[in-house]
């Protein structure tokens, strides 16, 4: 992935 873990965590949160 090209996104850092922080972004992934945020996406998971909003998902």
Swiss-Prot record:
Tagged with keyword Glycoprotein: yes
Description of post-translational modifications: Glycosylated.
EC number of this enzyme: 3.2.1.118
Organism superkingdom: Eukaryota
Enzyme class: hydrolase
Record keywords, A-Z: Glycoprotein, Glycosidase, Hydrolase
Catalytic activity entry: (R)-prunasin + H2O = mandelonitrile + D-glucose
Any one GO molecular-function label of the UniProt entry: prunasin beta-glucosidase activity
UniProt key word Phosphoprotein: no
Subunit-level organization: Monomer.
Name under which the protein is recorded: Prunasin beta-glucosidase 2B
Native source species: Prunus serotina (Black cherry)
Taxonomy of the source species: Eukaryota, Viridiplantae, Streptophyta, Embryophyta, Tracheophyta
